[in-house]
Amino acid sequence: SSTGDKDIVGYDWLMVDLDPTRPSGTSSSDAELEEAKNLGNKVYLALRNLGFEKPLFAYSGNGVHLLYKINLSNADERVALVKKCLQVLDMMFSTERVKVDTKNFNLSRICKLYGCKSAKGADTKDRPHRMSHIIGNPTEIKVTDIAYLEKLANLIPDEADKPQEYNSYSPSSFNVEEWMQKYGIQYKAVGCSDGTKYILDHCPFNENHKGKDAMVFRRNNGALSFVCLHDSCADKHWKEFRQFYEPNAYERREAVRQERMYHSFNRHMQPPQRAT
């Protein structure tokens, strides 16, 4: 029988696989491979800012690999953590032309042996077969502590804020695009694996943080998150982002919540009995 996840004792590596979008069964063009390398550099810089150690950097033949030494045991919560890290990287960095592979979380996943040829499809001038090889290897490969994996996973929480607008006592869905337009926030909307990514013109907390460094995410479940890739903004989340433009947003919501509770309580109160 083949080797399954249950047969593996743990993770040695977190493999971030950046794969160019191209016709099925074909090799990447030189331009597509260069785009994957450029995206790999962005992922590298962002994870270094987050506290990750230096990875092993390699060409797979058609895309780019960043391999981070992690040394995690085989446990359900560890698998869930690695899966979430790849999902967050996908939401943050995948483009229409290059995707972060989110399937590399399972323990029995195998990686290309560098030095082997990648021979997918016909070997043509525009889409040639290439040798996989290591681009960069740190002098000392250090283990990235689990705390930094958790930090990455928590950049986009599973249950982030779900703000609402209140009209009397009937809440309606919060329209984040209308809200950003109201406050003059410039953005570019891009679809991602679990909702929509809004790439901001700049971070409101530091206007020097620009060039896709600051983003708002709206997940399919309605949850909203704000992320700036710079370490100085690590403590800034959706709540702080919204309060930057709308300082009293959460105080108003709490006041409305208490008022609704008050009216609900009064409706269920029994009228006083008249004395006889």
Which stretches of residues belong to each language-model region?
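Short beta-strand
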Residues: 55-62, 101-106, 191-193, 216-218
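Long, charge-rich alpha-helical interaction segments
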Residues: 125-173
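N-terminal single-stranded DNA-binding subdomain of primase/primase-helicase replication proteins
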Residues: 188-241
